[in-house]
Amino acid sequence: PAASLAEVIARQRAMGWNVLEDTTVYLRRGGDSISLTGLSFDPALRHMRHDPDLPPADLSGAYRDVPDSLYNITAVHIPQLWGQIADAGYGDLTLAGHVHSMQMKLRLFGRAFSPAQLLYTRWSGRYDEGGRTLYINDGTGYVVFPMRLGTYPEITLITLRRCE
């Protein structure tokens, strides 16, 4: 997996993509700016990727010199880091994946249920807490079994609008 990930990243860079690995870039439009941070998935956490509580992550490099006054969007693979990101004062909007609703989701009476709830407090969709938002995308892939039951492939389009 590490070799294939390195190959994907190399191909993305060859296409001119700016791969955000523990780094922040700034998006400017007119006189406004927002910061966009990408956090790498630490290979040391691979064996803990389903644990609800992770050891403290070193976020200092990714957010170095990011002004607190700027709206920050953070992209991170595993949603369990959201608490640490928020506690550090970042991630006004955090985008995550990884869970895929464990490839099974049942919708009943306007609610969704999944085996993912057994492992994760936050496992799919939007969560708002303390003035910050986490969005967990169900993605398009699968793990182990090439199937998805009730967890439809998802690509999310988010439109940012200025507060008035």
Regions of interest found by a model, annotated:
Residues 1-164:
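Soluble catalytic domains of enzymes that build or remodel membrane lipids, polysaccharides, and related
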